[in-house]
Design a protein with these regions (language model features):
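C-terminal motif of bacterial Sec signal peptides marking the signal peptidase cleavage site
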Residues: 26-29
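Conserved PDZ fold ligand-binding element
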Residues: 102-103, 314-349
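Nucleotide-binding motor/catalytic cores of P-loop/tubulin-like NTPases across gene-expression machines
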Residues: 307-310, 339
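Bacterial N-terminal signal peptides that target proteins for export
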Residues: 4-18
């Protein structure tokens, strides 16, 4: 039986003169962690951990009415007008601070119809009180699909939303989404955290790591709106869904608030976001595969590809040179296996990318590598992630 994955869609309403077009974000590929701009990796599986936290269930006080009452004044509708006949788009966003900064998805206020991603010609913000004002784009981060906007706050009673913490999320925790699905402003949907630490495609060929999966209904126009916890704090921004039909099927994804904080800080400082880059694609090692290959480790990231002239290539890392299908999964074997990064073990498929993302371009990491049955220490000076 052949298993295929459904397409994912970024949820804005996009208008042209005649038709409504949904912006499709194809899957980043099947696979483990990828830091190259190649998306041919195996389907990622996620290892769930359960932190010791108090889960916010209904009996602990999850009140959708209260969440909506507290958060909805800070949720806005965003309309973008694009250059060169690119039409217009509608999405959602939220007020970040009293100075008039607003957060949304980058794909709500940018367009790639001309071959490169460019900011919209005009952006307008509509508040719940029906005021509509122009906004400027401070910057956008295509890697995290985050954009920072700015309005002049004078004369407006802004309601900034509080930012939460996605590090202690647990599966089953109730959440709420507010936005403008199909242009229906100030719409609330509720659900639960279906999974954490997902990897989803960004506006580049790299992945957004740590994404939150939810069954809260997300539809066209929800993009950029907040995903909220029981305290009406922002856990993420609703970004895309996985579907066969183009309509909501209960598998939605939000960019985590930790990624939003990082993007916003860089966009405020320099108008763009930079990420460290190593230049490899990996596939996860697990006990049965390790036994099959005779590896002296039951975990790690097996290098299926090393991008030419990348930091990994310059450090001498080697990718796979042979193909093997094992337990119905194709592998590129024969390359190095990264066991740890700066002493942190690489266990889950996204661990390598997650560790690299905590660094800045120009910093050096030490990898423990399994090569030809021997363990070696390899230092890699990280580069700047390319946008292409």
């Amino acid at each position: 039986m052949t298993v295929t994955r459904s397409p994912r869609y970024g949820w804005i309403k996009r208008y042209t003169a005649v038709v409504l077009t949904l912006v499709a974000l194809s899957l980043a590929g099947c696979g483990g962690s990828s830091d190259s701009n190649d998306s041919a990796a195996q389907t990622a599986t996620v290892t769930q951990t359960t932190p010791q936290v108090v889960v916010q269930t209904a009996e602990h006080g999850f009140d959708a009415v209260r969440v909506f009452h507290e958060a909805s004044p800070g949720v806005v509708t965003i309309r973008s007008v694009f250059r060169g006949g690119g039409g217009a788009a509608e999405g959602s966003g939220f007020v970040l601070d009293p100075e008039g900064r607003i957060v949304t998805n980058a794909h709500v206020v940018t367009d790639e119809s001309s071959g490169s991603r460019k900011a919209a010609k005009e952006v307008f913000i509509e508040f719940p009180d029906r005021n509509i004002v122009p906004a400027t784009i401070v910057g956008f981060d295509p890697f995290a699909d985050v954009a920072l906007l700015k309005i002049e706050p004078d004369g407006f009673d802004l309601h900034p939303l509080r930012l939460g913490d996605d590090s202690e999320l647990v599966v089953g925790q109730p959440v709420a989404a507010i936005g403008s699905p199909f242009g229906e402003q100030q719409s609330l949907s509720v659900g639960v955290v279906s999974a954490t630490d997902r990897s989803v495609e960004s506006l580049t060929k790299f992945q957004i790591e740590g994404a939150i999966q939810t069954d809260a209904s997300i539809n066209p126009g929800n993009s950029g709106g907040p995903l909220l916890d029981a305290g009406a704090r922002v856990l993420g921004i609703n970004e895309q869904i996985e579907t066969n039909s183009g309509s909501n099927s209960g598998v939605g994804f939000a960019v985590p608030v930790s990624a939003i904080k990082r993007s916003v800080a860089q966009l405020e400082e320099k108008g763009e976001a930079e990420y460290a880059y190593i230049g490899v694609s990996t596939q996860p090692v697990y006990p049965q595969l390790a036994d099959k290959l005779g590896l002296d480790t039951d975990h790690g990231g097996m290098l299926s590809e090393v991008v030419p002239d990348s930091p990994a290539d310059k450090a001498g890392l080697e990718g796979g040179d042979k193909r093997l299908t094992f337990q119905a999964i194709p592998y590129e074997i024969g390359g190095d296996v990264i066991i740890s990064v700066d002493g942190h073990p690489v266990v889950a498929p996204d661990d390598l990318g997650r560790y690299i993302s905590t660094h800045q371009p120009g910093q050096t990491v030490q990898l423990e590598v399994l090569r030809d049955g021997k363990r070696e220490q390899v230092d890699v000076t990280l580069g700047k992630r390319p946008r292409g």
